[in-house]
Regions:
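Active-site metal-binding core of divalent-cation-utilizing nuclease and nuclease-like domains
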Residues: 61-108
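Charged, often low-complexity linker/regulatory segments
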Residues: 1-50
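Short catalytic/ligand-binding loop motif for oxyanion handling, primarily in non-cytosolic enzymes
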Residues: 105-106, 121-126, 187, 202-206
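Extracellular structured ligand-interaction cores
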Residues: 91-95, 110-114, 170-172
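Non-catalytic C-terminal interaction segments of nucleic acid-processing enzymes
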Residues: 171-265
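Short loop/turn segments at strand-loop or loop-helix junctions that form parts
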Residues: 115-121, 196-201
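Acidic, metal/cofactor-coordinating or nucleic-acid-engaging core segments within structured domains
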Residues: 128-194
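Conserved catalytic cores of phosphodiester-cleaving nucleases, focusing on short active-site segments
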Residues: 96-98, 111-119, 178
Length: 265
């Protein structure tokens, strides 16, 4: 059977995955405009910036502990030391990552846009991190990851003066690691805009979970999912970290239709 998107796997032909590639497909000015829509009013994305994926040309999802062109190398190396006791593990995969400017005018700083995308409610899972393997390295990394998330949780509590943070390796691991990484990157001096992106009207995913009809419904869904881990009043609020740069968490919704079948070249 002909795949609609031959660059993607057979199980990646619908939902949020192809939409992320479609969102980053087009001229550099077009893509920069779309990504700016995820960041504004807190910042912008220029056409000269680096982002991944890059349409269907670069379909890889970045792990930020590995050297990349989006954040400084020294930050990637520090993230690796923070998250792993032993090299060789995998860190969170980001659906979209882009350089961005955070702030306005002369006060703007080079930052990073981190996107976690969803097309239906069942993608917002509350699972714990998978158990560690039998090897000593796996066990040590499992513990280190728990320690890193605990460190981020304490840091966010201090930062906001809100004891309502409850990030954990052992519950709601996905949203916990997303906020932990956003916090750590900002603590390392890189402003962060963390976007939970809801793709509206993904009707082809209705067999998997409830789809999202409007931005308000998506926002309610994200905040309900995050409740108990992330205080509701931190969304859309720039948080000033100890490094002097901002961390901003957002829930944003867009309509991105699946285009007609892409034919192989």
């Amino acid at each position: 059977m002909l795949k609609r998107f031959p660059e993607l796997g057979r199980n990646e032909q619908r939902g949020s995955k192809p939409r992320c590639h479609l969102l980053t497909d087009g001229t550099r000015a077009e893509v920069a405009g779309r990504l700016t829509g995820l960041v504004k009013p807190f910042g912008s994305v220029s056409k000269g910036y680096v982002w991944r994926p890059r349409g269907f040309e670069r379909t890889d999802e970045l792990q930020l502990h590995i050297q990349n062109r989006v954040i400084p190398l020294k930050v990637s190396r520090e993230l690796q030391r923070w998250w792993f006791a032993v090299r060789g593990g995998a860190s969170p995969n980001w659906d979209i990552v882009s350089q961005c400017s955070v702030g306005k005018g002369t006060d703007s700083k080079d930052g990073v846009l981190l996107v976690e995308a969803k097309a239906h409610s069942a993608e917002l899972n509350s699972d714990a991190k998978s158990p560690a393997g039998a090897s000593d390295g796996s066990q040590r990394n499992h513990k280190r990851i728990g320690d890193a998330i605990d460190e981020a949780n304490v840091g966010l509590q201090r930062l906001t003066g809100n004891a309502g943070w409850s990030l954990s390796r052992d519950h709601c691991y996905q949203i916990s690691n997303r906020f932990a990484w956003a916090w750590k990157i900002a603590e390392l001096g890189v402003p962060v805009v963390l976007v939970y992106l809801g793709f509206l009207d993904a009707s082809e995913m209705s067999d998997k979970g409830d789809t999202f009809a409007d931005p308000e419904g998506w926002g309610r869904c994200v905040k309900a999912h995050a409740k108990g881990q992330v205080p509701e009043d931190v969304w859309e609020q720039p948080l000033q970290t100890s490094s002097g740069v901002s961390l901003i968490a957002r829930a944003v919704a867009v309509r991105q239709a699946l285009r007609a079948a892409r034919m192989p070249a």
